[in-house]
């Protein structure tokens, strides 16, 4: 005979069992290896930063955080692999402002939607691009470049590592704001571009901080940094704003993203741990050697805001240059 008391007892037992299964299914995050995708090949600033971050997070989270290189299509392949992963916090990706703001403007077919398929977790690092010229160049200031370009239209060249790269667009923005024209020369690598620049075959180039050793050695001459404030690695080099381009503020920045719909509590935990690691003095010091700084505001909301601002800045330039990659 089944009594009311029996039913209540059975129901209580069932609830307890369900709670046990639920607790097991929702084990504290993380309980296994986390994958951090770098959407570029090994080497460079992204690799150094990722290695430092993975070491710090592995220690902090008590679970391995490992690097997974997935290069191709200007970073789109690696980011897409994470965008299509399970939204559980175990697949993360380093995204750059080029991927988030320039790629959607120049690629005719994006495999993912930067606004819908990714969840910003934290801002990571920032660095200024550096306007460099050959050491024997007659240019010693922005005014020198502008005067030469206006006196001899069409003779100046600027290099970048690819059509549609942030370096190309920085050069185009520089030309527009100064009312001059320059011929863009795309290269397959930064090494190739810098070799020709050192040899005097190119007039100038916006490059990343990996060129700082060449500047320190006197093989290249730095005329300006592109951010709104001077670089602590090159404190003697003025900003473009200091030389008359008041609205020129171009930085390269990295952020960490997860697939869209990653649970908020997991995103918040990851953001807190990333912020903790990146706030350490030793972490900052190792990056500063490279000319790179930790983002002053690491909140996820900053990623979304900067995306919107930079898409508005680059859209008219990309449109006018008719840059399209199939």
Language-model-derived ranges and their functions:
Residues 31-33, 177-178, 216, 264-326:
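An extracytoplasmic/periplasmic, membrane-proximal ligand-sensing/linker region
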Residues 24-115, 155, 180-206, 214, ...:
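N-terminal (or domain-start) structured segment
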Residues 111-123, 159, 181-185, 203, ...:
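Short beta-strand->loop
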Residues 1-6, 14-28:
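N-terminal twin-arginine translocation
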Residues 84-90, 105-192, 240, 253-286:
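Hinge/capping helix and adjacent helix->loop/strand transition within the periplasmic-binding protein
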Residues 42-43, 97-98, 126, 134-139, ...:
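Short coil/turn segments
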Residues 211-279, 309-312:
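C-terminal lobe and pocket-closing loops
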């Amino acid at each position: 005979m089944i009594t009311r008391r029996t039913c209540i007892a059975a129901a209580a037992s069932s609830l307890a069992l369900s709670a046990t299964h639920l607790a097991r299914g929702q084990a504290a995050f993380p309980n296994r290896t986390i994958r951090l995708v770098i959407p570029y090949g090994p080497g460079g600033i992204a690799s150094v930063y990722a290695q430092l971050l993975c070491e710090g997070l592995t220690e902090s989270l008590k679970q391995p955080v490992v690097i997974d290189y997935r290069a191709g299509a200007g970073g789109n392949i690696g980011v897409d692999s994470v965008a299509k992963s399970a939204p559980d916090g175990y697949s993360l990706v380093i995204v750059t402002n080029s991927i988030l703001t320039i790629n959607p403007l120049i690629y005719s077919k994006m495999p993912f939607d930067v606004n819908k398929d990714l969840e910003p977790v934290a801002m990571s690092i920032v660095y200024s691009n550096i306007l460099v010229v050959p050491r024997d160049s007659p240019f010693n200031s922005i005014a020198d470049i502008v005067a030469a370009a206006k006196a001899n239209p069409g003779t100046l060249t600027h290099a970048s590592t690819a059509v549609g790269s942030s370096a190309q667009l920085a050069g185009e923005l520089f030309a527009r704001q100064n009312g001059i024209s320059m011929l863009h020369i795309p290269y397959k690598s930064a090494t190739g571009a810098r070799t020709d620049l050192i040899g005097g075959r190119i007039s100038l180039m916006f490059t990343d901080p990996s060129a700082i050793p060449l500047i320190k050695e006197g093989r290249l001459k730095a005329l300006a940094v592109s951010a709104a404030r001077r670089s602590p690695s090159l404190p003697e080099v003025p900003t473009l704003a200091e030389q008359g381009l008041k609205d020129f503020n171009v930085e390269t920045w990295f952020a960490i993203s997860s697939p869209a719909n990653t649970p908020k509590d997991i995103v918040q935990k990851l953001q807190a741990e990333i912020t903790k690691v990146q706030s350490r003095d030793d972490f900052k010091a190792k990056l500063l050697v490279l000319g790179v700084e930790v983002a002053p505001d690491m909140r996820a909301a900053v990623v979304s805001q900067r995306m919107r601002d930079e898409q508005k800045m680059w859209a008219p330039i990309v449109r006018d240059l008719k840059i399209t990659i199939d």
